[in-house]
From Swiss-Prot:
PANTHER family: 30S RIBOSOMAL PROTEIN S14, SMALL RIBOSOMAL SUBUNIT PROTEIN US14M. Keywords: Ribonucleoprotein, Ribosomal protein, RNA-binding, rRNA-binding. Binds 16S rRNA, required for the assembly of 30S particles and may also be responsible for determining the conformation of the 16S rRNA at the A site. One of its GO terms (biological process) is translation. This is Small ribosomal subunit protein uS14. Gene3D superfamilies: 1.10.287.1480. InterPro entries: Ribosomal_uS14, Ribosomal_uS14_bac/plastid, Ribosomal_uS14_CS. GO terms for molecular function: rRNA binding; structural constituent of ribosome. Belongs to the universal ribosomal protein uS14 family. Part of the 30S ribosomal subunit. Contacts proteins S3 and S10. GO terms for cellular component: cytoplasm; small ribosomal subunit. It holds the Pfam family Ribosomal_S14. SUPFAM superfamilies: Glucocorticoid receptor-like (DNA-binding domain) (SSF57716). It comes from Alcanivorax borkumensis (strain ATCC 700651 / DSM 11573 / NCIMB 13689 / SK2).
Amino acid sequence: MAKESMKNREAKRTKLVQRFAAKRSALKAIIQDPNAEPEAKWDAQLQLQKLPRDSSPVRQRNRCRLTGRPHGYYRKFGLSRIKLREAAMRGDVPGLVKASW
């Protein structure tokens, strides 16, 4: 299991991303607008840099919902490979069966 502090850190990042999403997208739209003035683009770039680092979605890490494990993560299920296998063996995941040929 992942440390509790790592899970809390990820939760904090998720909240920051949600809080600054609108502001971040507005600033990016100004920066990418070909008709915008260079000064406006420069100001938008500076404001974007002043936002918290953790408010950027690329700093988030997908983690298992049960254990917090960061590797071997299956997006479709939100679980790590280990917990997904355990759930499949118990029959908790509908339609998922062990391969046999």
